[in-house]
Amino acid sequence: IKEILERVKYESSIYVTLTTLKYLKKGGRITPAAAALGTLLRIKPVLTIQGEKLDAFSKARTAKQARSIMLTALAKDLDERFHDKNAEHTYLEIAHTCNEEDAKELEAALKEQYPGADITTAPLSLSIACHIGPGSLAVACSGKLKELE
């Protein structure tokens, strides 16, 4: 099992959007000035995690625009990284922090776009949620293990 996990640990893409920059500031991930400016401009950041690295991916002005950015990025990853345009050999995951309504909307959009895909929706773990705050929404894709199919 350890060999399989070591081999596939970088074979996933995760996109996260936040409703507030407060928790990134508290955790020291952004400066107080960046948090104040982002809050003033009502920026909804879209972050990406690929492997062990968390990076800024894009900025949106509305939650709807942030979700659209995440779905577009996910579609690109499915096509180019996973070579699975229809998500038939890929798991799709949605996670949220106290944002079940938006998570269900995102799940409906994914089901419409990828009718045969395995889609899971769940709350984010507390170990992550405490760093990004309530209202956050994430979408992820990861390749299915051939050993389990």
Features from the language model and the residues they span:
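Mixed-charge interfacial surface used for oligomerization/domain docking
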Residues: 1-149
